[in-house]
Amino acid sequence: MSGLTEFFRGDISRASRVALLVVALALIPCLFLPVWNIGLKAPQYPQGLELKIYSNELTGDLQEINILNHYIGMAEIEPDEFREFIFIPFFILRFLGFAVLAALVGRMPIAAIGYIDFSVFGAVMMFDFQTWLTRFGQGLASGAPLTIDPFTPKFLGVTSIGQFEVTRYPAAGGTIMLLAGALGPVILIYELVRRRRAAS
C-alpha cells in the first residue's frame, strides 16, 4: 500500500508529460467539433436525417425530426431544455487545464485527479444522455397517428422504431475525447513499468 501511495505522489516522466500535452491539444477541437451524431432513416426521408450534438448546441434536421416525433407521439426536441450545453465547454476547458498543468509541473497527483475528473464526467454524461433518450422513448403520447409501444433507445448503436431506423455513434469530437481518455491508462501503465524498472 505504501508503494502505491508513493507512486501516486511521485513525478511523471518526460514522455508522459508530452503525452499529456498531446491530450490537451487534442481537446481543443472538441469545443468546436460535433461530439455525438444521431441519424434517422424513414420512408418519408429515404436520404436520411441527422442531428449533430456539439458541446454547446444541437444542430441538423431538427424540424423534420420533430415532425416525425409528433407522428409517433414523442415529445419535441427543444435545444433550450438541454442545460448541459451551458457547462460542458467549461468542463472540457477544465480537463485541458489539468492536462497542461500536469505536463508542466510533472506531478502524478495532478495527472491522476485530472483523469479521475475526466472519467467521472464521461460516465455522468453517458448516463445523462441515456436518461434523456429514455424519457423521450418512454413518454409517448396517446392518440398519435402511428401507435407504437414505449421503448428505451440506446445511446450507442442502432434502434428500430416502427418504420424508422435510428443510429447513434460518436462524432469527431466524441471520438477524440474517447481516444484522449484512453491515453490515461496507457500513461499509468507506462509509469508503473518505468518505476519498477528503475527500482530493480
Where are these regions (language model features)?
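Interfacial segments of alpha-helical transmembrane regions
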Residues: 13-24, 98-125, 197-199
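Juxtamembrane loop-transmembrane helix junctions in multi-pass integral membrane proteins
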Residues: 4-14, 105-109, 161-172
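Hydrophobic alpha-helical membrane-insertion segments
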Residues: 24-36, 113-140
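Long, glycine/tryptophan/cysteine-rich extracytoplasmic
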Residues: 32-85, 130-168
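Hydrophobic alpha-helical transmembrane segments
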Residues: 22-26, 84-109, 175-186
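C-terminal structured interaction module
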Residues: 160-190
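Membrane-interface capping segments at transmembrane-helix boundaries
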Residues: 189-200
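Hydrophobic secretory-pathway targeting helix
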Residues: 2-37
